[in-house]
């Protein structure tokens, strides 16, 4: 039986210092997968060594690639070339990683062998039909639990069919799964997205040598086309700090009076920075120093000072660029003066937990006035410090856990989370980093 790891967060003194945020989770997954498909050696530095990404590394080994961590902390991959993956001898256990599972399903769907996927209880409850449907149209066969849930078996096709597929919901994971399947497919595979989603797959594929076209789609949006059978060439990849992980110390510094922190080398891809745009609209003092390009991705050093925030209306169309950041935005909204309305959040219902419900319940327990709607969260801030004094159920969701630990840093009384184990999936050093800046997070009872 897995033992829970409760944590408590107490009101902090002003936060100060510089802290390295871990590598971007989305880019880390993709670097391992494309390095495994490339011809020759790829060296990845800055890889996120959280559980989700380590599961992907283990899966790429199981599929025949050479993957090793070097003494200097970098990762070396020697790939098998497009179409060269091998049938794994065992089940691919994705743990809690929805990104890893969906992208790998695309990767193996156009290889002529069978793979078995499983995951933890949370992942086994998440919908996979959105990936299964387009990959089936390309020729892959699936056997799954009801609703397309894990565990499932994928039998790839030896003669995949290129498709043009319009995403029914904005999803970078589904888009990327189809593009990865398209690499080992003759001709051109096209994904149409009406709302732009994070484009790390497109950027990294080009960086490895694939032909990827991004054009305006008829009727609006973008058409992304990948040309099959490219010769991907091994190359160095530098993974920037994850803007989704940086969100937690950023919001903490905004809320704890007198704080000033610096976060170096944070990814600033415009399709990932919706939270930062929203915080600036709320009155946040965030500076983006030394903007630069790093292996095809924009990065900057973030300087954050404590700020008085005001409530705002967050447009629904911003959701794809900040879908993982709504929990921590809701915490910021709880300290703001005025009402913050967040809409277009239906996708939060099928994340690691029902994040919409989890945030509403947690905020209410901390004394915050909040309304939960079908696809919206409305937080009524008063400009006063929330009471806190609650233990929040995380539902084994790393972002729920970290969000409420940040809340405890600025609330009148401590906030505890019932289990912090899931934090290791994306931010293993979270407690150490936050306490190093001045937080008071511990395993003691509040």
UniProtKB/Swiss-Prot annotation:
UniProt keyword terms in alphabetical order: Amino-acid biosynthesis, Aromatic amino acid biosynthesis, Cytoplasm, Transferase
PANTHER family: AROM/DEHYDROQUINATE SYNTHASE, PENTAFUNCTIONAL AROM POLYPEPTIDE
GO molecular function: 3-phosphoshikimate 1-carboxyvinyltransferase activity
Enzyme Commission numbers on file: 2.5.1.19
Sites where the protein binds 3-phosphoshikimate: 25-26, 30, 171, 173, 324, 351
Function: Catalyzes the transfer of the enolpyruvyl moiety of phosphoenolpyruvate (PEP) to the 5-hydroxyl of shikimate-3-phosphate (S3P) to produce enolpyruvyl shikimate-3-phosphate and inorganic phosphate.
Enzyme class: transferase
Biological pathway: Metabolic intermediate biosynthesis; chorismate biosynthesis; chorismate from D-erythrose 4-phosphate and phosphoenolpyruvate: step 6/7
Key word Transferase present: yes
Entry-linked CDD domains: EPSP_synthase
Disulfide pattern: none
Coiled coil: none
InterPro entries recorded: Enolpyruvate_Tfrase_dom, Enolpyruvate_Tfrase_sf, EPSP_synthase, EPSP_synthase_CS, RNA3'P_cycl/enolpyr_Trfase_a/b
Localization, UniProt: Cytoplasm
Domain of life: Bacteria
One GO term describing the cellular component: cytoplasm
Primary localization class, coarse: cytoplasm
Residues noted as binding phosphoenolpyruvate in the record, renumbered to the chain: 25, 98, 126, 173, 355, 399
Region of interest called Disordered, as start-end residue ranges on this chain: 1-20
Binding partners and assembly: Monomer.
Family from the record: Belongs to the EPSP synthase family.
Name of the coding gene: aroA
Protein name: 3-phosphoshikimate 1-carboxyvinyltransferase
GO biological process: amino acid biosynthetic process; aromatic amino acid family biosynthetic process; chorismate biosynthetic process
Lineage of the organism: Bacteria, Pseudomonadati, Pseudomonadota, Alphaproteobacteria, Rhodospirillales
Pfam assignment, any one: EPSP_synthase
Catalytic activity: 3-phosphoshikimate + phosphoenolpyruvate = 5-O-(1-carboxyvinyl)-3-phosphoshikimate + phosphate
């Amino acid at each position: 039986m897995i033992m829970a790891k409760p944590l408590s967060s107490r009101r902090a003194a002003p936060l100060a210092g510089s802290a390295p945020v871990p590598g971007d989770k989305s880019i880390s997954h993709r670097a391992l997968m494309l390095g495994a498909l490339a011809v020759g050696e790829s060296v990845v530095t800055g890889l996120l060594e959280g559980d989700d990404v380590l599961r992907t590394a283990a899966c790429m080994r199981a599929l025949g690639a050479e993957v090793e961590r070097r003494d200097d902390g970098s990762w070396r991959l020697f790939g098998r070339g497009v179409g060269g993956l091998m049938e794994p001898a065992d089940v691919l256990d994705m743990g809690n990683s929805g990104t890893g599972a969906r992208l790998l399903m695309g990767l193996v769907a156009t290889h002529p062998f069978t793979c078995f996927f499983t995951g933890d209880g949370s992942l086994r409850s998440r919908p996979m039909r959105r990936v299964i449907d387009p990959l089936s149209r390309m020729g892959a066969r699936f056997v799954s639990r009801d609703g397309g849930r894990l565990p499932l078996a994928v039998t790839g096709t030896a003669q995949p069919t290129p498709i043009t597929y319009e995403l029914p919901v904005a999803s970078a994971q589904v888009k990327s799964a189809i593009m990865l399947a398209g690499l080992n497919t003759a001709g051109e595979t096209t994904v149409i997205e009406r709302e732009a989603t994070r484009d790390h797959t497109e950027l990294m594929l080009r960086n490895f040598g694939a032909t990827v076209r991004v054009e305006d789609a008829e009727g609006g949006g973008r058409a992304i086309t990948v040309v099959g059978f490219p010769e991907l060439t091994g190359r160095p990849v530098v993974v920037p700090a994850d803007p989704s992980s940086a969100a937690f110390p950023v919001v903490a510094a905004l809320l704890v009076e007198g704080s000033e922190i610096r976060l170096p080398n944070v990814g600033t891809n415009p399709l990932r920075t919706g939270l930062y745009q929203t915080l600036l609209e709320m009155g946040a003092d965030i500076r983006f120093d030394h903007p630069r390009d790093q292996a095809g991705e924009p990065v900057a050093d973030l300087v954050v000072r404590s700020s008085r925030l005001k409530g705002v209306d967050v447009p629904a169309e911003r959701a794809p660029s900040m879908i993982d950041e709504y929990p921590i935005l809701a915490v910021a909204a709880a300290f703001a003066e005025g009402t913050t309305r967040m809409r277009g959040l239906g996708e939060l219902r099928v994340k690691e937990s029902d994040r919409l419900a989890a945030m509403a319940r947690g905020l209410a327990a901390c004394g915050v006035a909040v309304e939960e709607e079908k696809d919206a969260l409305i937080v009524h801030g008063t400009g006063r410090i929330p009471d806190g004094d609650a233990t929040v159920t995380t539902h084994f969701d790393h972002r729920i856990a970290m969000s409420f630990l940040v809340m405890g840093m600025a609330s009148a009384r401590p906030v505890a989370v019932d289990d912090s184990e899931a934090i290791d999936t994306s931010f293993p050093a979270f407690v150490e980093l936050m306490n190093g800046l001045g937080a008071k997070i511990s395993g003691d009872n509040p």
